[in-house]
Amino acid sequence: MRVSKVKVKDGGKDKMVLVHRKTTGAQLVYSGQPVSNETSNILPEKKRQSFDLSTLNKTIIKFDTAKKQKLNVDQYKIVEKIFKYPKQELPKQIKAEEILPFLNHKFQEPVKYWKNGKEESFNLTLLIVEAVQAQDKRKLQPYYDWKTWYIQTKSDLLKKSIENNRIDLTENLSKRKKALLAWETEFTASGSIDLTHYHKVYMTDVLCKMLQDVKPLTDDKGKINTNAYHRGLKKALQNHQPAIFGTREVPNEANRADNQLSIYHLEVVKYLEHYFPIKTSKRRNTADDIAHYLKAQTLKTTIEKQLVNAIRANIIQQGKTNHHELKADTTSNDLIRIKTNEAFVLNLTGTCAFAANNIRNMVDNEQTNDILGKGDFIKSLLKDNTNSQLYSFFFGEGLSTNKAEKETQLWGIRGAVQQIRNNVNHYKKDALKTVFNISNFENPTITDPKQQTNYADTIYKARFINELEKIPEAFAQQLKTGGAVSYYTIENLKSLLTTFQFSLCRSTIPFAPGFKKVFNGGINYQNAKQDESFYELMLEQYLRKENFAEESYNARYFMLKLIYNNLFLPGFTTDRKAFADSVGFVQMQNKKQAEKVNPRKKEAYAFEAVRPMTAADSIADYMAYVQSELMQEQNKKEEKVAEETRINFEKFVLQVFIKGFDSFLRAKEFDFVQMPQPQLTATASNQQKADKLNQLEASITADCKLTPQYAKADDATHIAFYVFCKLLDAAHLSNLRNELIKFRESVNEFKFHHLLEIIEICLLSADVVPTDYRDLYSSEADCLARLRPFIEQGADITNWSDLFVQSDKHSPVIHANIELSVKYGTTKLLEQIINKDTQFKTTEANFTAWNTAQKSIEQLIKQREDHHEQWVKAKNADDKEKQERKREKSNFAQKFIEKHGDDYLDICDYINTYNWLDNKMHFVHLNRLHGLTIELLGRMAGFVALFDRDFQFFDEQQIADEFKLHGFVNLHSIDKKLNEVPTKKIKEIYDIRNKIIQINGNKINESVRANLIQFISSKRNYYNNAFLHVSNDEIKEKQMYDIRNHIAHFNYLTKDAADFSLIDLINELRELLHYDRKLKNAVSKAFIDLFDKHGMILKLKLNADHKLKVESLEPKKIYHLGSSAKDKPEYQYCTNQVMMAYCNMCRSLLEMKK
């Protein structure tokens, strides 16, 4: 039963209950009110309804269970009525055998409870029979007494549990924390714990023999009653407990006082609950599984692993407490703030890793160490192997030819990333509020090794000014690349740009849904099946994709997204009337819908819990309320499967914005957006089309006005953040913007406006590629050579319809999808993938098939649209007959499917094949591979960031140490430096000088060498035993450090990287995270989810060495004509989300060794 983040009635009003934790204990409080202990007021009276439901569920089985067991459901309802509606009349007659199957196992036997200090018991089946025979409910009084006793006992336990849910620091530790601390010294010294004593005291061997003696119950068909068997195992454990802890009358005080024995016992309980669950579970044990899990050795080994994992987690928690300087006045609000900060830090760490990889590609693409490290950066500069052309791709101009100026430029980009990374890696308390306040950077020279340079005194100030001045050009170029200029008249575009003032920044209200979610949600609501459950939002603007050709649909999508983000959102989230109207409409329609579906339950509708927007509410106030409720509901339902239930507050917010955007688009000024028409002559050459587009772009530039309000080009901190943003791609910039918006809400006093504007400015040109090859290549041959690895050898691309060479037969065409892979360093990897299989290359056969398909594709799209409309009409006709309850069904939809279903599917497959060929001809598939690679590496870097965080917390736990680590450091390397270079001063050893300090902050000097050597030895032993689990194996220790660096620095993309495949790195990452089993297991799920997001089903399996291997990688399915995955295969009409050929490429990406 939940007592937190739920609503209760108090004084006639609904109030949200929260748990407020402190170091002295916890208490229930009301949300939005001064903190006051309401625990006794809420429990049990204000949760009476929940307690009643709890007792009902303990008494009888659930309705679904009765159906599943094929019991008499009518008889179930008769029995249920006795307990659920105690004021209603009893049934006229009932037999014991009609009651017993519906009682939970506990109530099928005599039930014991305590009344007035005396043990009582009753047989519920007999009570019911007697009560029915006498038609006297007073016969059920023993059951009502049990219910009163149960609620009071449960309530007292809940109160005690809440009170004990304190924040554990060093004082007032829980029994579990005390036990873990008792084992900690042994564990950190050896990397293991010896449980021999507790195996003996707990008599584990005896327990396992008792468990093995429990015989499974079978039905008349020989099928095991799993639930009854698992209850039997639980009963055996309960019978074993008195032998260890004694009974209430004769307790074993010594064992009961042993905290470690108590925790050992709890682990045994959890073991049985996990492998032999009584609650509904997907686990299905075979006979071999049962034999294995009931072995004494299996139980002992598992418990040891679980306890070791818990000890590590406790060490990390202690380090976290020390790191954040949590004191006795710490509350749950402080913990929420820390959690929010950590989420932001981890996200920003991944962003910094991506930016650092881009710096490495510019400065020294063979560097496998940390390019942001000062020593490694200097070594790379000395190679003088910088890539000025690549630098210009990011900043618009190449590096200076003057050596000093060039190095200042490079130190500037390093400083912009390195300082942000260092700030977030070592943040404490409120440090994140100033994480972006960077004005100077290291710029050492021979004469001044510690020289600092201000960003306002660099070339980056002029470049920032230039970027601000060119916003109209960037905006116009975005309209061109998005397809707006190709599919809308200049007159319409000019009218739109001059009539409305587009905002540089979208709304900064957190939880405002993104365009994709609103767009897809609107399409689903507007075009859903119009039956009795049709949800009417009176929408008009969300037209289906099938209504448009591919390119015109993309242009319309771009325009709608632009209008939503830069016009609608800023206005809608400040126009109180429009916002309130949408809120009121959605709530009204939701109530009407509930009444239509179930007229008897007028009070029960999905958004009943959402309070109306009052006249006193501002938009910000109301959204803050909705946001608070949404977060609470997310927490409440976080343990459920995501698809199992849709959160009402999330759905409410989505509908408000869907309706609001639909209303906004009804203005006549937007009519043209729904009717994209090609503006270029179809027969024109690619060069002619490009020239025409450039002319159209130039003609609207003057009208493209986006004016920044907060970004200042003379502010050094703004310039530094601008440099940082220029090193990111559009995906990372968008994610950073979204995270900043969310994070800003937790740090209200810190202003983010200028950061958000700078991000939006950089987004305008982030992934823009020059269209003239001369801006990127020194010759035509070099440009064409860039394409050759991806094209079939010997193919004559000069005859491929201006796809790769212009109509003059020699001028190359720039392909943005290729150039972006060059910019972000994945080109060599993509070449390797494509070279794995000749079918991966773009071939003459691909061109011929694509060229042929082009001639009929528009007609086929129209044919698919017509078929779909016919099916919708047939389905609606069937629904109408259903509503009219006609006896004889016409089955219009089924007849349509029988006649046209296969044709419809063939057309869909043909269109999908054309789209795949079109993607190959324009290298879109390479861009997707590039994006997937960056996401995979970024996700792995995110796990390494967690490893680094926990590494640091491990050190912070050793608060009494004379020396501390400030982050990840190769202790083996330092140890060698200390012992092999005795003549050097310690302060000259880079790693020690910068990574290790004394607690009091003094510099380490020669006089403490012996102490330092002993410290390093002790620290290495501590980490190797307790964290890395490599004992004294120096080779394995170094391998783990190398793997950490390999993943953290994106070394998978470098020329000199070690010979790893991505699946190898996933396995190595799991090994790195072995210290936290939950985190280790999360690795594979994270990558399965990532491929799912990209439209693929990734299945992994463990080989004989317990290493993950790819079992299969297949496309996800899209179901058509009302079919679903639940239908029999012969009734499924489905196509693939992605082509199998693309899945094969992605599998090569995973398995290919670099």
Curated annotation (Swiss-Prot):
Pre-crRNA processing is metal independent, while crRNA-guided target RNA cleavage is dependent on divalent metal. It is an enzyme of class 3 (hydrolase). Its EC number is 3.1.-.-. Residues 330-466 are annotated as: HEPN-like fold 1. InterPro entries: Cas13a_endoribonuclease. The keyword RNA-binding applies. Residues 923-1154 are annotated as: HEPN-like fold 2. GO terms for biological process: defense response to virus. Target RNA acts as an activator for non-specific ssRNA degradation. Belongs to the CRISPR-associated endoribonuclease Cas13a family. This is CRISPR-associated endoribonuclease Cas13a. It comes from Paludibacter propionicigenes (strain DSM 17365 / JCM 13257 / WB4).
